[in-house]
């Protein structure tokens, strides 16, 4: 089944779920809170007493007021093609940890070898580009690559693909886009091809980090934005993409989860110094 058809199928599944629950998302024109995405305030910058402890399995959403106040993520522009995308998770080269950059959706590299700017500052052209539904590319030389998302949520780690595939229907997932800003939605389907989220995005959000929020105020990365269809978004799993491009995600030293103590987490990470 094609990716667009799968996104359409995800929309149908979501619609059926709403019908079966006999619930409405609005009453008298006013929005009603979805129990699966209750607006629990998350304190940005909070840290656990023991950063290596296993994180919670209950994930939260980011309240709209807090999301709206967050600065938009860095925009990447390929100058020759004009292609605009979002800087994905901050990474370090597996072979050279001091080399920093961003992982991005593969289709952002429209003219290979062309110059790329990050927030107006020129960095290296995209490299190691792989195309397709789960395409990926990287750009290096980004001095502003930091282990945070959504304006200050510290990155704790990356969930393995099989763990993300077991996330339940309705699990809150958030995105940090250069165009749409910080948005949160819910899981509609997970399979071997990727993660489907009820989350409207805009052109230019491709590559944006998809992440889960813990009540410690930290972010756990699960994927990057690849495609959209209506109010639904398809994301590629982050962990296997990192292996394909020889990169590791930067984590914050005060928030990092040790994959040796929590096997749900990938070891494709490095603590930012």
Residue map of PLM features:
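C-terminal motif of bacterial Sec signal peptides marking the signal peptidase cleavage site
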Residues: 19-22
